């Protein structure tokens, strides 16, 4: 009996011990898993392509502004710090997640075709020099009405408050930032700048301004003050718009005050696609979300992970499949026509998200990369490869904004309005690459049409794990390649957010050739060549891809701005 009693007591004690151990593990493990790295923020973050603009966005959040408020303030700043990329003379696309409703919306304020555009504009596509275009390529700017619509729907602070930091920046002795200086003093841009009206802004006599030179820009400061006080309508139906139109008319622009008054941003549903445990929300055509979704939908079927790419052959295999998916994607870019101007293709972009198409494409991908262009439906028409800016914001309540803005190629049309301080876009150049594969006919522009775009401001949400990735990029046709690889690196390969963005990328051009960023892994590069992947013979002068992202993982918030553009994120 004594032995049995002792056994019972031991079993009871063992059970109690196991129970306590389970309780301890249940309490300790979540805390361990939720521990944040030293570079994490705990509440909110902003990732713009410069530190000063990220900081301005952060301050707006700390003043109880909404993520949309912060994004707008950061974009206004970026139009000054990186005017070669974006500004009031361009267009913007917002993808916005409202944590209180769980709803995602897209605000599309991309530029449009003016009513009195040159009827023979597209005849100039073949000979167009994207870096020396001109007034005939100017689209109706949508930037400010895009801000106004986003602020009307989601703003919290007074409109004028969003402009004050940048007005102060201009009034207090603004100097040329290093990145702007690089663009101003790049050999392939200088001849165009020298012959343009931008001379009066960016030249000191016969020399272009250099880093830290004073950059007086009183006209833009005055414009921002007017817009802050009177609202966006002063540009679209007021005196500022009249001044802008008059300034650029003598440079060949056919933009009218009627074009400005007629512009309306579109509020639309995002494209939505399951990506493992995440849901990807991205902008529909004419933005590039359908192409980004298509690529990731194809790639997810191959189940790449950190383990599968651990060895050299695994890396080569993954990049081979990526290259092949990018080739098929380039062949689908014609689907990005504006569905409002071309209703016949309204549902074509949705086809790109279908699992049946993804499965079909996977079956077309084998171990070789030397198939004919027709295998991928490639047309050989090249898009622009630089320009644009992106801001990602995550607010304290979990709401998020991904916003991409552009004037198209560096310095846009290189047309300057001296009385408003606004640089104009050359967005109509993007109409040149919207003909179908196998056809040499490019449909004539439609007044009010928005040109196709590679912009992909995107938000990926994992409701179960409480994770969120807010991401987008710049770089023209490089955007989708760069954003795809950043997402793959982060979500599938387990990179830190900073490393996911910093990793050298590859890109597939319209001829199916692979272009490698400097410092791309040479072993992988050789492995791809062994599989028949052809390298582009004309290496681009510089890779201008730039990705900004914020990643929320439980209580941890990580933000990264691309060092390629000397960016730095900010948060708290």
Swiss-Prot record:
Active site: 388
Positions in the Cytoplasmic compartment: 1-6
Record-level Gene Ontology MF annotations: glutathione hydrolase activity; leukotriene C4 gamma-glutamyl transferase activity; leukotriene-C(4) hydrolase; peptidyltransferase activity
PROSITE patterns associated with the record: G_GLU_TRANSPEPTIDASE (PS00462)
InterPro entries reported for this sequence: GGT_CS, GGT_lsub_C, GGT_peptidase, GGT_ssub, Ntn_hydrolases_N
Keywords: Acyltransferase, Glutathione biosynthesis, Glycoprotein, Hydrolase, Leukotriene biosynthesis, Membrane, Protease, Signal-anchor, Transferase, Transmembrane, Transmembrane helix, Zymogen
Regulation: Inhibited by serine-borate.
Tissues where the protein occurs: Widely expressed, but at low level, except in the airway epithelial cells. Detected in brain, heart, kidney, liver, lung, spleen, testis and trachea.
Keyword Repeat in record: no
Substrates-to-products reaction catalysed: glutathione + H2O = L-cysteinylglycine + L-glutamate; an S-substituted glutathione + H2O = an S-substituted L-cysteinylglycine + L-glutamate; leukotriene C4 + H2O = leukotriene D4 + L-glutamate; S-[(2E,6E,10E)-geranylgeranyl]-L-glutathione + H2O = S-[(2E,6E,10E)-geranylgeranyl]-L-cysteinylglycine + L-glutamate
GO biological process assignments: amino acid metabolic process; fatty acid metabolic process; glutathione biosynthetic process; glutathione catabolic process; inflammatory response; leukotriene D4 biosynthetic process; proteolysis; response to oxidative stress
Extracellular topological domain: 30-572
Pathway: Lipid metabolism; leukotriene D4 biosynthesis; Sulfur metabolism; glutathione metabolism
The enzyme's E.C. designation: 3.4.19.13, 2.3.2.2, 3.4.19.14
Keyword Transmembrane helix among record annotations: yes
Topology of the protein relative to the lipid bilayer: Single-pass type II membrane protein
Annotated L-glutamate binding sites: 110, 406, 427, 453-454
Residues modified by glycosylation: 98, 185, 194, 204, 277, 303, 347, 377
Spans traversing the lipid bilayer: 7-29
Subunit structure: Heterodimer composed of the light and heavy chains. The active site is located in the light chain.
Name of the protein: Glutathione hydrolase 5 proenzyme
Source organism of this protein record: Rattus norvegicus (Rat)
Upper lineage: Eukaryota, Metazoa, Chordata, Craniata, Vertebrata
